Amino acid sequence: MESIVKFLEKGQPYFDKVSKNIYLQAIKDGFLAAMPIILSSSVFLLISTLPGVVATVGGFTLPDWWNVDVVNFCNKVYNFTMGVVGIMVAGTTASALTGSKNRRMPAGKAINATSTMVAAMCAMLILAVTQTSAKIEGADVSVFFTDNMGTKGLLSSFVAAFATVNIYAFCIKRDITIKLPKEVPGAIAQNFRD
Protein backbone atom coordinates (compact mmCIF):
# COMPACT_ATOMS: atom_id res chain seq x y z
CA MET A 1 0.00 0.00 0.00
CA GLU A 2 2.84 2.37 0.86
CA SER A 3 4.44 1.81 -2.55
CA ILE A 4 1.21 2.84 -4.27
CA VAL A 5 0.98 6.02 -2.17
CA LYS A 6 4.64 6.85 -2.91
CA PHE A 7 4.05 6.30 -6.63
CA LEU A 8 1.01 8.60 -6.58
CA GLU A 9 2.87 11.28 -4.61
CA LYS A 10 5.81 11.08 -7.01
CA GLY A 11 3.50 11.50 -10.01
CA GLN A 12 1.41 14.29 -8.46
CA PRO A 13 3.02 17.17 -10.47
CA TYR A 14 2.47 15.25 -13.69
CA PHE A 15 -1.14 14.45 -12.78
CA ASP A 16 -1.77 18.12 -11.94
CA LYS A 17 -0.40 19.20 -15.31
CA VAL A 18 -2.55 16.68 -17.17
CA SER A 19 -5.68 17.67 -15.22
CA LYS A 20 -5.20 21.33 -16.20
CA ASN A 21 -5.03 20.60 -19.94
CA ILE A 22 -7.93 22.52 -21.51
CA TYR A 23 -8.43 19.92 -24.24
CA LEU A 24 -8.79 17.04 -21.78
CA GLN A 25 -11.10 19.20 -19.65
CA ALA A 26 -13.20 19.92 -22.74
CA ILE A 27 -13.50 16.19 -23.52
CA LYS A 28 -14.52 15.49 -19.92
CA ASP A 29 -17.05 18.34 -19.86
CA GLY A 30 -18.37 17.39 -23.30
CA PHE A 31 -19.07 13.84 -22.17
CA LEU A 32 -20.63 15.04 -18.93
CA ALA A 33 -22.99 17.29 -20.88
CA ALA A 34 -24.01 14.37 -23.11
CA MET A 35 -24.30 11.93 -20.20
CA PRO A 36 -28.08 12.30 -19.60
CA ILE A 37 -28.77 11.33 -23.20
CA ILE A 38 -26.32 8.42 -23.03
CA LEU A 39 -27.83 7.10 -19.79
CA SER A 40 -31.44 7.42 -20.93
CA SER A 41 -30.69 5.63 -24.20
CA SER A 42 -29.04 2.83 -22.21
CA VAL A 43 -32.31 2.34 -20.32
CA PHE A 44 -34.12 1.84 -23.63
CA LEU A 45 -31.47 -0.70 -24.66
CA LEU A 46 -32.06 -2.62 -21.43
CA ILE A 47 -35.82 -2.63 -22.02
CA SER A 48 -35.37 -3.90 -25.59
CA THR A 49 -33.24 -6.84 -24.40
CA LEU A 50 -35.77 -7.79 -21.72
CA PRO A 51 -37.59 -10.45 -23.83
CA GLY A 52 -34.38 -12.45 -24.30
CA VAL A 53 -33.49 -12.22 -20.61
CA VAL A 54 -36.98 -13.26 -19.51
CA ALA A 55 -36.98 -16.22 -21.91
CA THR A 56 -33.53 -17.37 -20.82
CA VAL A 57 -33.76 -16.80 -17.07
CA GLY A 58 -37.50 -16.99 -16.39
CA GLY A 59 -38.35 -19.74 -18.82
CA PHE A 60 -41.35 -17.95 -20.35
CA THR A 61 -41.89 -15.48 -23.17
CA LEU A 62 -43.46 -12.05 -23.19
CA PRO A 63 -46.51 -11.28 -25.36
CA ASP A 64 -45.97 -10.70 -29.08
CA TRP A 65 -46.91 -7.02 -28.84
CA TRP A 66 -44.03 -6.55 -26.38
CA ASN A 67 -41.56 -8.50 -28.51
CA VAL A 68 -42.43 -6.50 -31.62
CA ASP A 69 -43.85 -3.08 -30.80
CA VAL A 70 -42.04 -2.23 -27.57
CA VAL A 71 -38.71 -3.68 -28.71
CA ASN A 72 -38.88 -1.84 -32.05
CA PHE A 73 -39.70 1.44 -30.30
CA CYS A 74 -36.89 1.01 -27.76
CA ASN A 75 -34.38 0.12 -30.48
CA LYS A 76 -35.45 3.19 -32.46
CA VAL A 77 -34.92 5.47 -29.45
CA TYR A 78 -31.54 3.87 -28.76
CA ASN A 79 -30.39 4.19 -32.38
CA PHE A 80 -31.43 7.84 -32.60
CA THR A 81 -29.63 8.76 -29.38
CA MET A 82 -26.51 6.59 -29.17
CA GLY A 83 -26.38 6.52 -32.95
CA VAL A 84 -25.70 10.26 -33.03
CA VAL A 85 -23.72 10.62 -29.80
CA GLY A 86 -20.64 11.59 -31.83
CA ILE A 87 -22.43 14.66 -33.15
CA MET A 88 -23.64 15.62 -29.68
CA VAL A 89 -20.19 15.18 -28.14
CA ALA A 90 -18.64 17.28 -30.92
CA GLY A 91 -20.98 20.14 -30.02
CA THR A 92 -20.68 19.84 -26.26
CA THR A 93 -16.88 19.48 -26.40
CA ALA A 94 -16.64 22.55 -28.63
CA SER A 95 -18.84 24.50 -26.22
CA ALA A 96 -16.69 23.49 -23.23
CA LEU A 97 -13.46 24.32 -25.05
CA THR A 98 -14.91 27.68 -26.08
CA GLY A 99 -15.46 28.52 -22.41
CA SER A 100 -11.82 27.70 -21.62
CA LYS A 101 -10.55 29.68 -24.61
CA ASN A 102 -12.72 32.68 -23.70
CA ARG A 103 -11.05 32.88 -20.29
CA ARG A 104 -7.71 33.25 -22.09
CA MET A 105 -8.86 35.72 -24.77
CA PRO A 106 -7.83 39.39 -24.71
CA ALA A 107 -10.25 41.80 -23.06
CA GLY A 108 -13.24 42.70 -25.20
CA LYS A 109 -12.95 39.63 -27.42
CA ALA A 110 -14.99 36.48 -26.96
CA ILE A 111 -15.92 33.43 -28.99
CA ASN A 112 -19.62 32.68 -29.35
CA ALA A 113 -20.18 29.21 -27.84
CA THR A 114 -23.33 28.54 -29.87
CA SER A 115 -21.52 29.28 -33.13
CA THR A 116 -18.65 26.94 -32.31
CA MET A 117 -21.08 24.26 -31.17
CA VAL A 118 -23.03 24.29 -34.44
CA ALA A 119 -19.87 24.61 -36.55
CA ALA A 120 -18.25 21.66 -34.75
CA MET A 121 -21.34 19.52 -35.34
CA CYS A 122 -21.28 20.39 -39.05
CA ALA A 123 -17.52 19.72 -39.21
CA MET A 124 -18.05 16.36 -37.56
CA LEU A 125 -20.65 15.44 -40.17
CA ILE A 126 -18.23 16.46 -42.93
CA LEU A 127 -15.44 14.36 -41.40
CA ALA A 128 -17.40 11.27 -40.42
CA VAL A 129 -20.30 10.76 -42.80
CA THR A 130 -19.83 9.17 -46.22
CA GLN A 131 -22.34 9.96 -48.95
CA THR A 132 -23.09 7.56 -51.79
CA SER A 133 -25.98 6.48 -53.99
CA ALA A 134 -28.01 3.31 -53.91
CA LYS A 135 -30.84 1.72 -55.85
CA ILE A 136 -33.97 1.53 -53.76
CA GLU A 137 -37.04 0.08 -55.47
CA GLY A 138 -35.44 0.73 -58.87
CA ALA A 139 -34.64 4.40 -58.26
CA ASP A 140 -31.22 5.95 -57.65
CA VAL A 141 -31.29 7.52 -54.21
CA SER A 142 -28.60 9.54 -52.46
CA VAL A 143 -27.83 8.01 -49.05
CA PHE A 144 -25.22 8.46 -46.36
CA PHE A 145 -23.69 6.01 -43.94
CA THR A 146 -24.38 6.89 -40.33
CA ASP A 147 -22.00 4.39 -38.74
CA ASN A 148 -19.49 7.06 -37.74
CA MET A 149 -22.06 9.43 -36.23
CA GLY A 150 -22.19 7.37 -33.04
CA THR A 151 -19.45 6.13 -30.78
CA LYS A 152 -17.31 5.02 -33.73
CA GLY A 153 -16.92 8.68 -34.69
CA LEU A 154 -15.76 10.06 -31.35
CA LEU A 155 -12.23 10.73 -32.60
CA SER A 156 -13.70 12.71 -35.49
CA SER A 157 -15.83 14.56 -32.94
CA PHE A 158 -12.79 15.66 -30.97
CA VAL A 159 -10.87 16.69 -34.09
CA ALA A 160 -13.87 18.68 -35.33
CA ALA A 161 -14.41 20.39 -31.96
CA PHE A 162 -10.76 21.29 -31.41
CA ALA A 163 -10.20 22.51 -34.97
CA THR A 164 -13.39 24.58 -35.00
CA VAL A 165 -12.71 26.36 -31.72
CA ASN A 166 -9.07 27.05 -32.60
CA ILE A 167 -10.02 28.48 -36.00
CA TYR A 168 -12.60 30.73 -34.31
CA ALA A 169 -10.04 31.82 -31.69
CA PHE A 170 -7.45 32.57 -34.38
CA CYS A 171 -9.91 34.70 -36.36
CA ILE A 172 -11.28 36.58 -33.34
CA LYS A 173 -7.83 37.35 -31.87
CA ARG A 174 -6.74 38.83 -35.22
CA ASP A 175 -10.10 40.51 -35.84
CA ILE A 176 -10.73 38.50 -39.02
CA THR A 177 -14.50 38.91 -39.24
CA ILE A 178 -17.14 40.01 -41.71
CA LYS A 179 -17.59 43.73 -41.16
CA LEU A 180 -20.89 45.31 -42.12
CA PRO A 181 -21.78 49.01 -42.41
CA LYS A 182 -23.01 50.85 -39.30
CA GLU A 183 -26.51 51.05 -40.78
CA VAL A 184 -26.98 47.31 -40.30
CA PRO A 185 -28.74 46.53 -36.98
CA GLY A 186 -26.40 45.37 -34.21
CA ALA A 187 -27.98 41.94 -33.77
CA ILE A 188 -27.51 41.09 -37.45
CA ALA A 189 -23.96 42.49 -37.57
CA GLN A 190 -23.04 40.47 -34.47
CA ASN A 191 -24.16 37.26 -36.17
CA PHE A 192 -21.77 37.95 -39.04
CA ARG A 193 -18.94 38.76 -36.61
CA ASP A 194 -19.50 35.47 -34.83
Predicted regions and their residues:
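Signature of multi-pass transmembrane helix bundles
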Residues: 1-38, 44, 53, 59, ...
